[in-house]
């Protein structure tokens, strides 16, 4: 059995502090929502980052996805989390390309700074426009027991948008599914390795291995050309299956990749599960939609195979 662990509130890193705190749907907001006494989390960004009604949401998700004739089996994926009008095409293509199992472990950055540094919500469900999506409590318990870095903490997920926006895409290809939400703060490289390898041990023991998902946008508020150059450096490290290189280049080149920690963890886990290659499924920037190339956010979709 695991012991309930708590951690002090985390601070935003210097990169996040350089991002203007405005509610732009092509980037990352911090908004309120609630978790009631039955541990049902209310949506934080329904009607903002994605349509708030089931009918309109289904229409939007179908616009950004397709029924691929052949699917690839991925150990892990990286997908963006902005408003669907900006990053839906990238996220949708990744979810369209890979096989979607009935369970996923989703790692997202903690934009709000609330809660533990590696926070798992292990019970209850997340309310979405179509109904509730249940958390896989058994898998969550096994993950908590496997890594002392993880803490049971629902508060970190209360206002976090970057995991919530992935659920409609999962539902598009798997009507009934469970998931484990994990919000990550500022872990060291060694902690990313330890956590990724612990996750891989648990996932590798499952008869139905979960899909490991890292939620991340790329460069924030850079001119389009600079964003593409910086993002290219990070993408190159991911395509080379080099989590250490990814972690370091994001810092050395000051790439404002908000989900570098989730991506590093999932890359370590995918390697431990036997990944031998990676594929860049799609890349774009917000400028491809808005036409504004002066300040863009980058979106990359990758699969680790």
Protein language model regions, located:
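Short, positively charged and aromatic/hydrophobic N-terminal segments
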Residues: 9, 34-36
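Short, basic/aromatic-enriched C-terminal tail that caps enzymatic domains
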Residues: 281, 286-305
